[in-house]
Amino acid sequence: VFAIIMLPLFMIDGLLRMTDIIQMPARFCDESLLKRYLAYVFWRFSKVATLKVALWTAKRYIFKRCYGFYKLFNKVHNNRITFISLRRDDISGNFAFVYDKLKNVDGLDINFILNDHTIADMSFKEIRSFTKACATSKVVVLDEFTPQIHYIDLRPQTKLIQLWHACGAFKTFGFTRLSKPKGSPQTTRNHRNYDYVTVSSTYCKKCHSEGFGIATDNVVATGIPRTDVFFDDAYKKQAQEKFYKEHPNFKGKKIVLFAPTFRGMVKETAFYPTEMFDLETVCQKLPEDYVFIVKHHPFVNDVQPIPKKYKDRIIDLSEDSELNDLLFVTDVIITDYSSLVFEASLLDIPMVFYVFDLEKYINERDFYFDFKLYAPGKIVYSLEQLISAISTNDFCTERIKPFADMFFDYRDGKSTERVVKLICDNLK
């Protein structure tokens, strides 16, 4: 990627050397002008590209050897737990709820590694910290696909627990996507070394077992820790008060949360086709008491600006606010293939599924169930249909309860307790 970014500079450099402003290396002087120029640019490009590959290979080698060193000369500490997340740079989400309980347990040594650095991006200090933590922890907890953990062979004494960030089982992932674009190859080590994966219901066990290439017995229906707040009236009231204090003009209005997922296969290429959701048109067509919260997926960086004339009706909280907290003030959700639908179903929030690219998404990504049959809300394919559904309160709300029943075994606010018990049981 770096070499591609540098390509325009290499081209300019080549032009300067063609005009003798800067001397052309002798090796290129026997060619015709065009061949000389192209050969020089390609040479510069390949040198940088090769250097990046060599650096990545070297760091991966150091990463593995560093882990081997700590594994050889350090013991596993039976009280040590390490949380690793590539999704967040603070203690939030499921980690926050689990940590809040664990910190009250005497004698635990709890560590966090919170950043999105790949092995190639890691400093040598970060490599040491990561590998030492993995080599000496009794339990390692993840909340996302973490490729670094699959480059090393964890000791049998170390238990790897995946608190998968999403509720339910919606979009296919992992080995379920073998035949799909960018799907995992059958030979990959990814995911297979999880000792336990926590899910929201018994129905999800088969999906996660298939997706991660692990035995069904390794998938445990504990519930999802961050959903416990939905059963905490005091927390709900606090979240509402906080939101209205920050956005007082939204109080008493009909709040619509626009929370789509990203398009693209990986974080680096993630996007949302903003031209398909024209904020100005939506505001024009719906009454003034409708206000909007825009909450794009964390992977999406290029989002549309808010029209000046509607700044009092639209706020973009893509980089702020915990998504769960926003649900406490939401009257209607506009989404597509986001796993947000699971949390929304717990709160019985009306939903509209704006899926203008459904067939393409099925071909490229697909679902664990028939989307048209099970989606817990109104399905629309155009902006006009979307506006009509909201205007007429046509949300197909009768589909919400069966959906929630399928994907949640527990609705008791005690999912965190069950996950904490699983972790502590593996410290013994």
Predicted regions mapped to residue ranges:
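Donor nucleotide-activated moiety binding/catalytic core segment of transferases
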Residues: 125-139, 293, 298-342
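Conserved catalytic-core segment of nucleotide-activated headgroup transferases in glycan assembly
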Residues: 90-99, 225-306, 380
